[in-house]
Amino acid sequence: MDWSQTLNLPKTDFPMRANLAQREPQFLRFWEENDIFKKMLKKNRNNKKFILHDGPPYANGDIHLGHALNKVLKDIVNKYKSLQGYYTPYIPGWDTHGLPIEQQVIKKLGVNRHEVDPVEFRKKCKEFALSYIDIQRQQFKRLGVFGEWEDPYMTLDPKFEARQIRVFGEMAKKGYIYKGLKPVYWCPSCETALAEAEIEYQEDKTYSIYVKFEVIDDKGLFANLNLSGKKVYIVIWTTTTWTLPGNLAIALNTDFDYSLVDVGNEILIVASELVERVMKTNKIDQYHEIARFKGKDLEYVKCKHPFLDRTSLVILGEHVTLEAGTGCVHTAPGHGEEDFEVCERYNIPVIVPVDNKGYLTQEAGKFAGLFYEDSNKEIAKELEASDHLLGVEKITHQYPHCWRCKNPVIFRATEQWFASVKGFREEALKAVDDVKWVPEWGRDRIYNMIADRQDWCISRQRIWGVPIPIFYCKNCRKELITDETIDHIAKIFEKEGSDAWFSKDVKELLPEGTKCPVCGCMEFEKETDIMDVWFDSGSSHAYVLESREDLEWPCDMYLEGNDQYRGWFQSSLLTAVATKGRAPYRIVLTHGFVVDGEGKKMSKSEGNVISPFDIINEFGADILRLWCVSADYTTDMRISKDIIKQLTEIYRKIRNTARFLLGNLYDFNPKTDKVGCENLKEIDKWALQRLYKLIEKVTKAYEEYDYNQVYHLVHNFCVIDMSNLYLDINKDRLYASKSESLDRRSAQTVMYEILVALTKLIAPILSFTAEEIWQNIIFKEEDAESVFLTSWPKVNENILKDETLEEKWNKIIEIKDIVAKQLEIARNEKLIGSSLDSKVKIFAKGNIKRFIEENKDIIQEVLIVSQLEVEEGDSDQIKVEVYKADGLKCERCWKFDTMVGKNEENLNVCPRCYEVVKVK
């Protein structure tokens, strides 16, 4: 007889093979066609808000794994909060101005930006940005990320630009905007100033040189020293030879000792502590010290520039250290921030002998016309020829490069517009402490950055961006910016966008009758610089959070990569504090970078770049989403094909757990078949307790943004509590009991609750799979169209906190583990095949024996053996013996029983199975 026809075997349309790459697009269509995101919002419309403000990715190129990690983490936050009942509108955004897009357009059109019509050029830049917004939008949606994709914010939106102008105006009104000559990062390739956030450091090999500056006025300090007519030189050390034409001073430290060292034919001055190192590096064996002076004694000594007709003044500066070089610092105020500041104190003028394109000017003398990098060799040759070159050393150092063109940048003093961070630094630091930083070290990182940072250079010498809304009087050159001019420009931009600045005449951009407040002239010129793109995105909180009814300022969270401490987190904080006196966010959460399987940075040259779509097209977006939580995302995340393949195995275990649960609930309707808590079998109550503990821990992990913990908890629950234990034990009563028996319905009641809860717990992470499971639950208590329209699972506190139940089942599982080892030995010795082939004898004494006897039936069920006997033992430790089971094997349930075949119809089944088939 085919007994399988009498069993309640699993039935489900939920496939074992996920085929995520093929199946996921169906769920994308389902979510879109049924407006699931909008329905999520509608469901929670009157509840507390949770607003995550999206940091705008740059609209050029396809998304990379860093983008994917970022957007998936945001999606996890939002979906969890929504399931918890929060109202979670999410407005994706794009950063659309700036250098990278300009460069792409120049490359595409093959034009010189200085010769092209600005309005036409800006039009091409806009088209380029919009085309990539469309591409990236589809790519982000493919990840399963929910949001207002058809109504995002863009920094090129006229309303955004108008709000940005008003933010600028508010800062100017408070005195935080000024124009000044200062050294800034300058990219000669891109011909523009750069912000610190636009700088990337790379390891460069270069030459450092030791240069002698002849002392021509010692202030009488050396008069009483017997120098034998030898010349005295102060030795400086530099890694940027090309800046020597800009040298105007030599900085010493007030408190350091400086030695006059006789090296035979001349006297050299270096910091006393560095004498030995400097002499060794420059291969000088014979030397002795003549005298020592404090740095402060040498102040105002004058030296002759080694190749220009100019003097270099000895000055004092706290920035001088003994970490490298000679303790005597080459000082060029046009090429360094500290140089600029220290020279300012001495009223030393600033010269900048390098032009916008990086070529040396007439102020560099015979080196004029050379590209700054090419001048290094020529200057070194000149120094050697004139006997001013003491030595050369090859070094490796971290040097700043342009974030976009990847070429080295220089420090160059130019007239730029700045936001005076000094003006509101204390407020900004206080605002940092009002924010929750996750991880906690983020607080110290941004605090120190703001405490130490200089004023923010906000002007750029480019075309594609929001113009700096300032005018200059043609007569007296006074800058003009007032409430009226800002309001007038903002209103124009709101209607026409910032293109109006380039297409309209000055008179149209100014309120009628505008006069210079100084000289009364009515003729003006426009500022030609645009704003730093970090000012664009840094103003997003003002536009996005305040202009949309369903959002609020400040928002709850910013979530970006940890490079944004010096980028968006900081620019947003600065504009917010300057205009509103507080941070625009309550929580800042950061993640690390994506690196390859060996922990190396991904780069095209290394050939180790993995696209998110390499993974999605082969394994599915849910596997990529699982990867996002598979490690501690607050540090760098490794990825490789091997890592992804390992994750598919973990995913399969979660999926198979869901499939088993679904397959055994095909005939269970919770509305009619549910068993009350008081009537549940004890093993089912234990399983519920395990579920409730899982819900409690997973909820805590989600609340703490510890998604890696969620991943481990869910995986362990599926494998250890479910597959290896509860579900395996349940198979017999699920398949072999009467379909409507209390025994089976008790199991189904709990399995239904486990399935529903598990589906919700994984939904923020495995969104596609959770939706697929939800759609395959035939009968549901919650009549929700989508898993994302349900509520977070709740726990039964009585069961959760039932310590007696927990202690009892901990003992039972301990016994199971001991027995399992002996069963494995018996299996290896070919005594048994399946555990049902066995009879187990447990030898125990005292309380443990009594415990096993009292719970013999439960323990036998848990052990999945045909017979269990308990006998008196002689040790405190239980002893286990395994035998072949007594009786015959039931052909229906495969248990051994001495009563198999002893029934009216002589069927080879056990008494339990006979009762079932007899009825059938």
Swiss-Prot record:
InterPro entries assigned to the protein according to its UniProt record, in alphabetical order: aa-tRNA-synth_I_CS (IPR001412), aa-tRNA-synth_Ia (IPR002300), Anticodon_Ile_BEm (IPR033708), Ile-tRNA-ligase (IPR002301), Ile-tRNA-ligase_type1 (IPR023585), Ile-tRNA_ligase (IPR050081), M/V/L/I-tRNA-synth_anticd-bd (IPR013155), Rossmann-like_a/b/a_fold (IPR014729)
EC numbers for this chain: 6.1.1.5
Alphabetic keyword roster: Aminoacyl-tRNA synthetase, ATP-binding, Cytoplasm, Ligase, Metal-binding, Nucleotide-binding, Protein biosynthesis, Zinc
Binding, L-isoleucyl-5'-AMP: 560
Subcellular localization(s) per the UniProt record: Cytoplasm
Gene3D superfamilies to which the protein is assigned, alphabetical: 1.10.730.20, HUPs (3.40.50.620), Ile-tRNA synthetase CP2 domain-like (1.10.10.830)
Binding site for ATP: 604
Motif ('HIGH' region): 57-67
Motif ('KMSKS' region): 601-605
Binding site for Zn(2+): 890, 893, 910, 913
Protein role: Catalyzes the attachment of isoleucine to tRNA(Ile). As IleRS can inadvertently accommodate and process structurally similar amino acids such as valine, to avoid such errors it has two additional distinct tRNA(Ile)-dependent editing activities. One activity is designated as 'pretransfer' editing and involves the hydrolysis of activated Val-AMP. The other activity is designated 'posttransfer' editing and involves deacylation of mischarged Val-tRNA(Ile).
NCBIfam families assigned to the protein according to its UniProt record, in alphabetical order: ileS (TIGR00392)
Domain remark from Swiss-Prot or TrEMBL: IleRS has two distinct active sites: one for aminoacylation and one for editing. The misactivated valine is translocated from the active site to the editing site, which sterically excludes the correctly activated isoleucine. The single editing site contains two valyl binding pockets, one specific for each substrate (Val-AMP or Val-tRNA(Ile)).
UniProt protein name: Isoleucine--tRNA ligase
Organism: Caldicellulosiruptor saccharolyticus (strain ATCC 43494 / DSM 8903 / Tp8T 6331)
